[in-house]
Design a protein with these regions (language model features):
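Surface loop/turn motifs at the tips and blade-to-blade linkers of beta-strand repeat domains
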Residues: 29-31, 79-81, 132-134, 175, ...
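Alpha-helical catalytic/interaction cores of small GTPase-regulatory modules
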Residues: 774-792
Length: 793
């Protein structure tokens, strides 16, 4: 292991070195015969994690940040952690964290701002203590700022604690510093890949490359195009399309690594730590042009300097503040552009010349930096191993995914230890929208990195395959847990305002769950899902509409049929509902979701319009009564308010009516309109009699006077002189010169004679189509013909 930079008590592991500044890489004599896994650097202390899980520390110990009583440059083991197998360590300015293989988190050091998460603000804690509030969580990843901490749990929950002077906890303005871990709800549902803390700012990275920043922004270190602090996570939109896979934070600057090996930096640049050949701050992410010809696989930020590793050449590039030797260039001056760290470096896959002294060369495995210090894990040329690639995400470190491997592991655990703790651990994952949202990413040509309001970025086929496997009887225990999780936790807790489009994939995933198609679960799964979708705010609701527009017709049709079946089920069982309000809310949810799907289908034509028809409507619902209720509601009548106000009328959703139901509805409408017209005429006649103006009385019938030898012309003439209201009245026909009273027979004869003339090919109004054997209006007719009064009748 090599190291360089500044140590107030001397370089770690070298007792004779009392000089604080080490300006070029030197071998760190610490535990030469044991393998170091990870190094974390604080303000003036260092933490070393060994492959066997032991933890060693050295440096200043003014606040107990070393976890033992000794102070100096010789690393000493933390005895209090000897019984734990530690897998990850992190440092703040004067405090430290250690994560065990069981997901438990320990803290020690300075605690005056609550940064230890121990529910106290003790000035110093010299012995590592378990953070009790996170004991029910399986923590996968931690990161420390100067005086605050971030932690990511297996179920996607994200916790912060410590100082909140600039909003770095992401909890909002109303929250002061926190002495115990607090859940950041504003990122719920997003499958997080990484959390990273700077001096007083914080970042979270999603599996699909969405970057969220908050906290101090005095130099633009959040990349949000301004210098205003943020108290809640904000999406760094300028990085959305860059496929970001890793983030490293300095005290007031930030560096991000993309999947293609590019590096973007932003924030404070007063020492050149952004690598843009200037000392200016940057409020927007800007690519480091000097590194564009190289594929970077590792980045690390110190307080005011930045490192980048290029495996093809084996070189480490450094830029920024060099006053304390932290760049490793052999000088103590600032550097504005990436410059190679001094030393003999070689690529793991490269070949050295025959004359080269192979024992001098180092092969980099991993770089670490923090404060004013840098450490490099490396090996000799002869027995080197490939360097760690930060672009390849380690599944053990990010939000848990639900796939064949995890299901097999759960099945084994439940068979061996079917206790409350095991079940709770499984339920936590299954109840997490974040875990589901990250589980079926479309990885073909990195499609999930394109996730947007128009592209969901998931592979629904893999979702379907997994659910089909779970329906196998051998997975009955897991299936039961999924069902319980969906019913009691996941669906009821879905947010009406998801923080990002990545949090919305769950709305496409859940309909693939086969038990939603089972009528036994309509009330507990299918209808609650519809309610959750309908609760969505305007913008996320539009996003879901866009995604539905993109799905395959088979998926869309299955969704339509699901809620058609739910409507039929509810109508068949409406009498069994003890509380009518519940029935009304359930069927309204199903109908409104169908309406939402219908509107989407109008734009994209996934299915034919008759796919929304529910043929059972005619037999399950009194169409005439339903239409009357709808009519009264539309008219705003005050009659029977308790019934009308809460009643659900299917006529509000005419797209579900087939021809039979629509015919009945139109007949009811015609009869109703006719009765309204007759009543109106009768009421006016009564008024005229009372005002002694009987001559102005109106007939309650529409009376047509026609001649048999000019039937069509007379009918059109008569219709043209009547108002729309008159046209809704019952019809009576009088043939000129005939004394017969029209009791219905004359009207029938009138229509028979009229249609006979209209359908005559010589007349030319209709055309007969041989293929369908149907009649329709002739193409030669102008649009004016269809607007004649006769057409309205």
């Amino acid at each position: 292991m090599l190291c360089w930079g500044y140590w107030s008590l001397g370089q770690p592991g070298i007792s004779t070195n009392l000089q604080g500044i080490v300006a070029e890489p030197q071998v760190c004599g610490f535990i030469s015969d044991r393998s170091v896994k990870e190094v974390a650097c604080g303000g003036n202390h260092s933490v070393f994690l060994l492959e066997d899980g032991e933890v060693y520390t050295c440096g200043l110990n003014t606040k107990g940040q070393l976890g033992h009583e000794r102070e100096g440059n010789k690393p000493e083991q933390i005895g209090a952690l000897a019984d734990q197998h530690i897998v990850h360590v992190a440092c703040g300015e004067s405090h430290s964290l250690a994560l065990s293989d069981r997901g438990q988190l320990f803290s020690w050091g300075a605690g005056s701002d609550g940064q230890l998460g121990l529910m106290t603000t003790e000035d110093s804690v010299a012995v590592p203590r378990l953070i009790q509030k996170l004991n029910q969580q399986t923590i996968l990843q931690v990161s420390c700022g100067n005086w605050h901490c971030l932690a990511l749990a297996a179920d996607g929950q994200f916790f912060t604690w410590g100082k909140n002077s600039h909003g770095q906890l992401g909890l909002g303005k109303e929250f002061p510093s926190q002495a115990s871990p607090q859940r950041v709800r504003s990122l719920e549902g997003i499958p997080l890949a990484q959390v990273a803390a700077g001096g007083a700012h914080s970042f979270a990275l999603s599996l699909s490359g969405a970057v969220f920043g908050w906290g101090m922004n005095n130099a633009g270190q959040l990349g949000l195009s301004d210098e205003e602090d943020r108290e809640s996570p904000c999406h760094v939109k300028l990085l959305r399309t860059q496929k970001v896979v890793y983030i490293s934070c300095g005290e007031e600057h930030t560096a991000v690594l993309t999947k293609s090996g590019g590096v973007f930096t932003f924030g404070a640049g007063s020492c050149g730590q952004l690598g843009h050949d200037s000392m200016n701050d940057e409020v927007n992410p800007r690519r480091v042009l000097e590194l564009m010809g190289s594929e970077v696989t590792q980045i690390a930020c110190g307080r005011q300097h930045t490192l980048a590793f290029v495996p093809s050449s084996g070189l480490i590039y450094a830029f920024g503040c060099g006053a304390r030797g932290q760049l490793g260039t052999g000088h103590t001056c600032n550097v504005k552009c990436p410059s190679p760290v001094k030393g003999y470096w070689a690529a793991h896959s490269g070949q050295l010349s025959a004359t080269a002294d192979r024992f001098k060369y180092h092969i980099v495995k991993q770089i670490f930096s923090g404060g004013d210090q840098t450490f490099v894990l490396c090996s000799k040329y002869e027995n080197s191993s490939p360097a760690v690639d930060f672009r390849i995400m380690n599944q053990a470190h990010y939000t848990s995914l639900i796939n064949d491997e995890t299901i097999a592991a759960w099945k084994q655990k439940l068979s061996e230890h079917n206790n409350a703790n095991t079940i709770n651990g499984v339920v936590q994952i299954l109840s997490s929208a974040a875990c589901w949202n990250g589980s079926f990413l479309e990885k073909k040509i990195d499609e999930h990195f394109k996730t947007s309001p128009k592209i969901p970025g998931i592979d629904l086929n893999s979702t379907r395959v997994l659910f089909e496997k779970l329906m196998n009887s051998q997975h009955s225990v897991i299936l039961e847990q999924i069902l319980n999780s969906f019913e009691s936790c996941l669906i009821p807790q879905l947010s009406s305002s998801p923080p990002d489009v990545e949090a919305m994939r769950i709305y496409l995933i859940l309909p693939e769950f086969p038990l939603l198609q089972d009528s036994k679960y309509y009330i507990t799964l299918t209808i609650p899902l519809a309610m959750a979708i309908l609760r969505l705010d305007t913008n996320p609701s539009k996003v879901l509409d866009n995604w539905w527009s993109q799905v395959c017709p088979k998926y869309f049709k299955k969704l339509v049929n699901l809620y058609k079946d739910a409507v039929v089920y509810l109508l068949q069982g409406r009498k069994t509902f003890l509380i009518p309000v519940l029935f009304n809310s359930y069927i309204t949810a199903a109908l409104k979701l169908l309406e939402k799907l219908y509107k989407v289908n109008l734009k994209v034509k996934h299915v034919e319009y008759d796919a929304f028809y529910i043929p059972e409507i005619s037999s399950l619902v009194d169409i005439q009564e339903d239409y009357l209720m709808w009519f009264l509601h539309q008219a705003g009548t005050k009659a029977r308010p308790s019934v009308i106000q809460d009643a659900v009328t299917l006529c509000s959703y005419p797209f579900i009516f087939d021809a039979q139901a629509k015919t009945k509805m139109l007949q009811t409408d015609a009869e109703l309109q006719m009765q309204v017209a007759v009543n109106g005429a009768n009421l006016q006649n009564v008024f005229m009699l009372l005002t002694l103006e009987p001559l102005l009385a109106r007939s309650p019938f529409l009376v047509l006077h026609v001649r048999r030898n000019n039937l069509v012309g007379d009918a059109l003439r008569e219709l043209s002189i009547h108002s729309d209201i008159d046209l809704k009245k019952p019809l009576k026909v009088i043939f000129d010169g005939e004394e017969a009273v029209d009791a219905g027979g004359v009207t029938k004869e009138f229509f028979l004679l009229l249609l006979k003339e209209l359908l005559n090919p010589i007349y030319g109004m209709f055309t007969y189509y041989q293929d369908s054997k149907l009649l329709w209006f002739s193409d030669t007719e102008s649009s004016r013909t269809f607007r004649l009064p006769w057409g309205r009748y």
